[in-house]
Amino acid sequence: DKIVGPGNIYVATAKRAVFGQVGIDMVAGPSEILVVCDGATDPDWIAMDLFSQAEHDEDAQSILLSWDADFLDRVAASIERLLPSMERETIIATALRGRGAMILARDLDDAIAVANRIAPEHLELSVEDPQAIVGRIRHAGAIFMGRYTAEAIGDYCAGPNHVLPTSRTARFSSPLGVYDFQKRSSLIMASAAGAAQLAKTASVLARGEGLTAHARSAEYRGAVEPAAEPGLS
């Protein structure tokens, strides 16, 4: 009844094709990382964090956001120096050219606003006090807090689910979790007195829509005098 889990473009296309006949968790796109950094983290660490998503796929998205222009330059230098040592150099280079960016924000507030607009799959808060700003992050699949919390440990062993919303869908969806394997039913039970009270409202609304059977179904149980049909005196 439901298909869940990650996959490549073929899996995503298949899930989209059967949606409506069965349930799905989400249609996931290429991997994404957004790093918000105050400029005090080792630039080699940040460069490798960007590589960690870029090596997945040539369409992967890797973005660094900082309000320290000198730090952006240092990370750019780290990327240039470290890239030739990567086994997936060609894939990483293609991804960074196509969907990589280093963005200079005005300040921390501007960086948070941009991060919420991007709504990334993975968000690293590589700052001195991530607890002070995490409450202002509204849209992100998984949030990695502090300089030592690399996205890679979330991929493999830190514990969060690795099936995360991509392509800005973190604005309205969440990581795969136990609630994706549950469903709910609404329960309604009215007493005779309750039916009599609610029938008055239901009758007026139903007759206003011209749905007489709805109205009379409620009126029978509530012993309500039928409301006048719209337009009739």
UniProtKB/Swiss-Prot annotation:
Transmembrane segments: none annotated. It is an enzyme of class 1 (oxidoreductase). Pathway: Amino-acid biosynthesis; L-histidine biosynthesis; L-histidine from 5-phospho-alpha-D-ribose 1-diphosphate: step 9/9. The active site is at E121 (proton acceptor), H122 (proton acceptor). Binds 1 zinc ion per subunit. One of its GO terms (molecular function) is histidinol dehydrogenase activity. Its cofactor is Zn(2+). Its EC number is 1.1.1.23. PROSITE patterns: HISOL_DEHYDROGENASE. The keyword Amino-acid biosynthesis applies. Pfam families: Histidinol_dh (PF00815). It catalyses: L-histidinol + 2 NAD(+) + H2O = L-histidine + 2 NADH + 3 H(+). PANTHER family: HISTIDINE BIOSYNTHESIS TRIFUNCTIONAL PROTEIN, HISTIDINOL DEHYDROGENASE HDH. This is Histidinol dehydrogenase. It comes from Thiocapsa roseopersicina.
